[in-house]
Amino acid sequence: MADFNQLFDQWANTYDNTVFSTDNEYTQVFERYETTLQSICDAIQDKKQGLTLEIGVGTGNLTKHLEQQGFQVIGIEPSKQMRRIAKDKLPHIEIVDGHFLSIPVAKTFDSIVTSYAFHHLNLEEKHQALTYLDSFLNQSGKIVIADTMFESEEYKRELLNKVEKDRAYNLLEDLKAEYYEYINDITDIFLNLGYSFTISKMNKYVWIICATKGGL
């Protein structure tokens, strides 16, 4: 798994400015950002009485939504600076050092959520991660992933061409360098693990996959 800690330690202080801004290269990626976070919460409303694990807490924006709506949350975040900011926002939430392939928590969960983070794993690591997360999830529990994904090769090609035409070169480099998958590649992993799933499109980049353990 690639080590992005230095990058995110540097980005931590300006991350919220990026996601909430309406005038930067990433504006369309984070379009309907709050709606996306709320949609994740909505997807696990039936699991509110259980325990929720959030991976890739970042600065705690999704965590804050979950806490305000009464969820019991444990957060995982590898970046020291991101953890610091999230803990300042949410001092009562347990946020520990870890990542998708290393969860130092001896508990099981009724829901596992992640937003704008799963793309840091390559496809093989995603397979390993979902298999690993399955071991922490109670029967009928849910895994919810919100991230940039592509519905087809043609859609990806057209989107990258548009980004290049718009001269959004930082975004273009990000889209090429990180591991943004085709939706079917991720849903196939869930199918092999015996999960049912739903898919929702939030903007031209971001989709939400909500997968239920034992749903098949």
UniProtKB/Swiss-Prot annotation:
Tell me which EC number(s) this protein carries.
2.1.1.-
Q: What does this protein do?
A: Could be a S-adenosyl-L-methionine-dependent methyltransferase.
Which protein, by its recorded name, is this? Uncharacterized methyltransferase Clos_1076
The keyword S-adenosyl-L-methionine belongs to this UniProt entry's keyword annotation: yes
Q: Name one Pfam family in it.
A: Methyltransf_25
Name the UniProt key words of this record, in alphabetical order: Methyltransferase, S-adenosyl-L-methionine, Transferase
Please name the source species.
Alkaliphilus oremlandii (strain OhILAs)
* GO BP annotation list: methylation
